UniProtKB/Swiss-Prot annotation:
An annotated GO cellular component: ribosome
Protein's name in the database: Large ribosomal subunit protein bL33c
Organism encoding this protein: Chara vulgaris
Keyword Ribonucleoprotein: yes
PROSITE patterns: RIBOSOMAL_L33
This protein's UniProt keywords: Chloroplast, Plastid, Ribonucleoprotein, Ribosomal protein
Gene: rpl33
InterPro entries referenced in this protein's UniProt entry, alphabetically: Ribosomal_bL33, Ribosomal_bL33_CS, Ribosomal_bL33_sf, Ribosomal_zn-bd
Family: Belongs to the bacterial ribosomal protein bL33 family.
GO molecular function annotation: structural constituent of ribosome
GO annotation (BP), single: translation
Length: 65
């Protein structure tokens, strides 16, 4: 039987630079969706990914849904 509380959850990663820059030409910041294991990484996930708005590799932070 499957457990009611899954260990893998879907999270949203948002660009740190785009979310802080309110005066940018792009109305929304760049976002990625991915999964993480709740048991192995209980803290918020931080990854370095490519941002299409900034045109460079930036830090992406996990955000609340």
């Amino acid at each position: 039987m499957a457990k009611s509380k899954d260990t893998r959850i879907t999270i949203i990663l948002e660009c740190n630079i785009c979310s802080n820059n309110k005066k940018s030409n792009f109305p929304k910041s760049s976002r990625y969706t991915t999964q993480k294991n709740r048991r192995n990484t209980p803290n918020r996930l931080i990854l370095k990914k490519f941002c299409s708005n900034c045109q460079q590799h930036t830090i992406y932070n996990e955000i609340k849904k």
